[in-house]
Amino acid sequence: MDPTLISLGALALAGAAATVSGCAEDLESDVGSQSNPNSQVQLGPQMGNIHRYFNKAISGEPVSYGLYVAVAGTIAWALINAGLNAVLAIIVGSGVAAIVHGAYSVSAFLGRIVGQSKKFGQPVYMDVLTSHIGPIVGHGFIAVFTMTLAAYLATTALGNPFPLPLVALIFGITVGAIGSSTGDVHYGAEREYQKYPFGGGIPVANQGDIDIYAEYGVRNGLDSSYFCSRFGGPLTGLCFGLIIFLDGWRSILGNIVGGDLVTKTSIALLVGLLVVAVAAVINRKLEVYARNKYGPYRN
């Protein structure tokens, strides 16, 4: 079979895996209130808002997912070199990473909540721990598995020269950064502040004054993930999937059109710059259109 067709198929699969990975990663962080929105959850009891959110801020998402995917990639790489089937090796590595993820989540939740119990009266709800840890580990496993699969395809079918553990680390950092900057805005700036007028941002005076009641009953992290699965999660997945797909596409296009290594590299760089320029123009047009249509925010 034509090597170019194999590369295109692998790239399509890697892009699809990255899309699923980004969505699962963002929804996992919504269940556990990690990264940007976590500072608001952490401030809630200090503002008198006793909540039932899962508060786990182990670290920023780029660092934590860099760790999880690197663990999965390292174990998978070792098992593959030992002769195990690649898919099984990735599953085993992702399972170990999920256990690490769960251990950090439990210790972070108990540590942060207990630290606020005496001074601010925030109880440790054990049912929140038991009901949220499953979705956290489950979404985390899906995210880590698909990221490790994309990293494996990059190192085998797409010609990435770096070893699987390093590529997995980079992919984990990347998807964590995208989830933190793209999907978490839907949770931290909207879901947690639905009692305030939409579009006003989060003034300093309102920080920590989070919503603690849902449409029915008291709100928790599972409600947040359900809400964000409609927009924030898919948007994160689309962003990460496009990054993986377009980055691989420019390299394949350089291999198709170019002859020697310098020509291939130059074409790939030019295509990458063109993609960035087109994305910047589209973003600008979209922002101007939205501002002209809806106007400035007024309280």
UniProtKB/Swiss-Prot annotation:
GO terms for cellular component: cytoplasm; plasma membrane; vesicle membrane. Signal peptide: none annotated. Its main location: membrane. GO terms for molecular function: tetrahydromethanopterin S-methyltransferase activity. Its EC number is 7.2.1.4. Pathway: One-carbon metabolism; methanogenesis from CO(2); methyl-coenzyme M from 5,10-methylene-5,6,7,8-tetrahydromethanopterin: step 2/2. The chain crosses the membrane at residues 57-77, 80-100, 133-153, 158-178, 226-246, 262-282. It is found in: Cell membrane. Keywords: Cell membrane, Membrane, Methanogenesis, Methyltransferase, One-carbon metabolism, Transferase, Translocase, Transmembrane, Transmembrane helix. GO terms for biological process: methanogenesis, from carbon dioxide; methylation; one-carbon metabolic process. It is a multi-pass membrane protein. It comes from the Archaea. It holds the Pfam family MtrE. It catalyses: 5-methyl-5,6,7,8-tetrahydromethanopterin + coenzyme M + 2 Na(+)(in) = 5,6,7,8-tetrahydromethanopterin + methyl-coenzyme M + 2 Na(+)(out). Belongs to the MtrE family. The complex is composed of 8 subunits; MtrA, MtrB, MtrC, MtrD, MtrE, MtrF, MtrG and MtrH. Part of a complex that catalyzes the formation of methyl-coenzyme M and tetrahydromethanopterin from coenzyme M and methyl-tetrahydromethanopterin. This is an energy-conserving, sodium-ion translocating step. This is Tetrahydromethanopterin S-methyltransferase subunit E. It comes from Methanococcus maripaludis (strain C7 / ATCC BAA-1331). The gene is mtrE.
